[in-house]
């Protein structure tokens, strides 16, 4: 097989790898709560971005639901979320990645230090 064909085959295989996100970044809510506000800021800053739950048709992210993120690039962020009971939590130094089915998730364990 020629080197050119091998290169094309390699690119095709890379694009077909299961589990690699080919589209927009997504958040996965692994908490047991409905999240009504989700904001990201570069680590260590208070520069909170837009409320990402506005991207959901009902304006909230239910437990085990995924949410398309808007205007977010891969990197490290502090994540501030509010659930439907009014609990506000900040999860620090979260890695947002582009090469998975979801960019990041938050679980109930991540919220263990939040006030209830």
PLM feature spans:
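Bacterial N-terminal signal peptides that target proteins for export
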Residues: 1-8
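Sec/Tat signal peptide C-region and signal peptidase I cleavage site
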Residues: 17-22
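Asparagine-centered strand-capping/turn motif at beta-strand->loop junctions
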Residues: 27-33
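Structured interaction patches on ligand/partner-binding surfaces of diverse proteins
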Residues: 82-112
């Amino acid at each position: 097989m020629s080197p050119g064909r091998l290169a094309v085959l390699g690119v095709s295989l890379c694009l077909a790898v299961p589990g690699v996100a080919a589209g927009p970044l997504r958040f996965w809510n692994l908490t047991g709560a409905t999240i009504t506000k989700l904001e990201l800021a570069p680590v260590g800053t208070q520069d909170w971005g837009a409320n990402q739950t506005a991207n959901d048709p009902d304006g909230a992210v239910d437990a085990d639901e995924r949410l398309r993120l808007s205007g977010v690039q891969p990197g490290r962020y502090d994540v501030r979320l509010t659930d439907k009971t009014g609990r506000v939590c900040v999860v620090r130094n979260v890695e947002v990645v582009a090469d998975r089915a979801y960019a990041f998730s938050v679980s109930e364990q991540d919220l263990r230090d939040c006030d209830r």
